[in-house]
């Protein structure tokens, strides 16, 4: 997709101006389109330079950014390309005082909260920025009458939780055995977890790198066969009555749970899956220690997040292999590994 030229900075200096999304030079319009299409069913290029998100919400671009534009609009130094959001404004009024500091996007529009299609578009673009290392520029006057423009740059590492969608159901005892090398002991009781000792943590780290060798092809084949047999027996009768949750801990601040349920509802990105329209088994990995609000994580929290992230990735790989699953992150984007 060709650039539409240099972004006209003068169009974005006044209150009420359109919002912008900006990305580093290595991000291509095709990557942006792929994520847009995964979020919205009616998304796609309408014409050169016009990418529909949903309904009347569109992105115009890409535009080039030079140093003078970055300085004029106070954009991050890495910004090289930009898209303008064209969307009919839909607002509900000021953000309630007790809700401030909870959500990055809501705080940015505290003076007049977006709702409906505008909120959906902004939320989706913020998720795309998190995935691609970009930023959302919110125009002046959005958080307060005389407030300057704001730059929202979500931390790519903040996307921790994963879900695996599979045609096959794995029972509690089998999943505990499958995931023990990477998640440790999993319990039905959220209050019964013991903090792992230093030696236990060392053993778990070693197990992560040796998980395939430890389980072996025969064990994985057995779990796959059991899941397939259960699915054949149950057919399309999987319901939330089969749901269960398991709890575990990887250390201080690194408590988590694995929720397993059946559902016909899947993210838009899976709408073309061969199993679409039938019940999926959903294996949800969620970090319980995630801090609330927009504050910066301290060192202990960052270490805990890193532990959980690595363990979740290993667990999701195992589940995807054992149950022929598809991994989706908390922003509803596909996750793949080389």
Where are these regions (language model features)?
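Acidic (Asp/Glu-rich) sequence patches and key acidic residues
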Residues: 1-338
